[in-house]
From Swiss-Prot:
Protein task: NDH-1 shuttles electrons from an unknown electron donor, via FMN and iron-sulfur (Fe-S) centers, to quinones in the respiratory and/or the photosynthetic chain. The immediate electron acceptor for the enzyme in this species is believed to be plastoquinone. Couples the redox reaction to proton translocation, and thus conserves the redox energy in a proton gradient.
Membrane topology per record: Peripheral membrane protein
Domain 4Fe-4S ferredoxin-type: 54-83, 94-123
Gene designation: ndhI
Main enzyme class: translocase
Major location category of this protein: membrane
GO (cellular component) term, any one: plasma membrane-derived thylakoid membrane
Protein name per its UniProtKB record: NAD(P)H-quinone oxidoreductase subunit I
Lineage, top ranks: Bacteria, Bacillati, Cyanobacteriota, Cyanophyceae, Synechococcales
UniProt cross-references to HAMAP family, sorted A to Z: NDH1_NuoI (MF_01351)
Amino acid sequence: MTFLKRVGEYVSDAFKAAKYIGQGMGVVFDHMNRRPVTVQYPFEKLIPSERFRGRIHFEFDKCIACEICVRVCPIDLPVVDWVYNTELKKKELYSYSIDFGVCIFCANCVEFCPTNCLSVTEDYELATYDRHELNYHQVALGRLPSKVTEDPMVTPLREFAYLPKGVIDPHDLPTGSQRAGKRPEEILAEMRAAKAAEAKEDKTAAEQSN
């Protein structure tokens, strides 16, 4: 009985192993028919979407040291140093810094800034060997990043989730095609069209009821 029991367990385990191997191979074969999801970085780089929140850009001359960015930041991240000018009777900005090693890129500071001195960029290449180098002061924050599409040594690729319908390879992107997602004016046009269609249906229903 012990021998037969062991044989039965062995056969059961063999069937389970074959089942799991079959499931794994099914996933492999399924991905063989899909488009590639890898990017040959740094020779290829993704073009960020329209609403991508990358490194913060700061304009020193526009800042009024109101510290609203500090108050709306979930982690109180921006460091704003200012001095009070007794002659002008107002604050004068001395220094401004953001530590991108801690920043969660929520862009609350950009949204609530009253003078628009803060803006988000497409820059996502912030890797460094020393985390202290991620603490950007006003000079570093004032530098504008270079665009992926302007680098002759890089092949720009659109984000795979935003490829146009019918396009499965980001290398074969049609010229002049939209970058990623829908632009605000397109969303607004769709909303207006939907609202007009709804108003037309209501008018038709009212005429039929009368």
